């Protein structure tokens, strides 16, 4: 079973996180699957857009795989953490419009992943969005902080990071953590509507705007790589 599936519907690539057993946890195997998909998407030259969804109706991405983490040395964990930063950075600056279709729980690293996408839609009736790092005692790196800070509501970012508060889709929309919240049967159709509108934009202009919106993250990545 592929951990991540990719298919094309017209001019829209649908990337499906496909680890129903573990809730699309992040571990080296998952990061490798992300890199494979990103390599395919980075080679796309025609106008397109990307939706990232999940085959699991309960979870979109619940963050680090703690079962895997228990057996890792500090050095191994640091290496995986850096790879996570690199993969999420690739998603942040992918030269195609990206839409997160959040079908369920979006926690910790999963919430960071959602934050780097251009737009976010979330299920309104079930599922939590939360930065749970404070409760699991894993502080964000400077790069991951800048990724979380891409969310437009800075007050919400501060509160969610410092409290670990879990919010549902409706509250996430009110706090502008997600752009829209919908019942499950409307979630993917609405994501497709947005993606189909976005792929028609001039990609050169779109990506120039994206670089401006995410310039603090870009600067932080450059600083860390030169340190």
Predicted regions and their residues:
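Short, active-site-adjacent cap segments at secondary-structure transitions
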Residues: 57-61, 107-108, 216
């Amino acid at each position: 079973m592929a951990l991540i599936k990719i298919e094309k519907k017209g001019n829209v690539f649908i990337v499906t996180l496909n680890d129903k057993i573990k809730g699309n946890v992040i571990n080296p195997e998952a990061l490798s699957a992300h890199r494979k998909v990103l390599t395919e998407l980075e080679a796309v030259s025609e106008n397109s857009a990307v939706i990232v969804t999940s085959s699991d109706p309960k979870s979109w991405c619940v963050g680090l795989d703690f079962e895997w983490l228990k057996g890792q040395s500090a050095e191994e964990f640091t290496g995986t953490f850096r790879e996570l930063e690199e993969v999420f950075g690739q998603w942040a600056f992918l030269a195609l419009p990206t839409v997160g279709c959040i079908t369920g729980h979006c926690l910790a690293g999963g919430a960071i992943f959602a934050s780097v996408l251009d737009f976010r839609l979330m299920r309104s009736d079930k599922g939590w969005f939360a930065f749970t790092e404070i409760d699991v005692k894993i502080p964000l790196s400077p790069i991951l902080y800048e990724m979380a800070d891409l969310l437009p509501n800075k007050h919400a970012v501060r509160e969610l990071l410092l409290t670990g508060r879990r919010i549902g889709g409706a509250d996430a929309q009110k706090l502008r953590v997600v752009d829209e919240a919908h019942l499950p049967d409307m979630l993917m159709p609405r994501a497709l509507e947005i993606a189909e509108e976005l792929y028609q934009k001039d990609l050169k202009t779109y990506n120039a705007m994206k670089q401006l919106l995410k310039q603090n993250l870009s600067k932080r990545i450059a600083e860390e790589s030169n340190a």
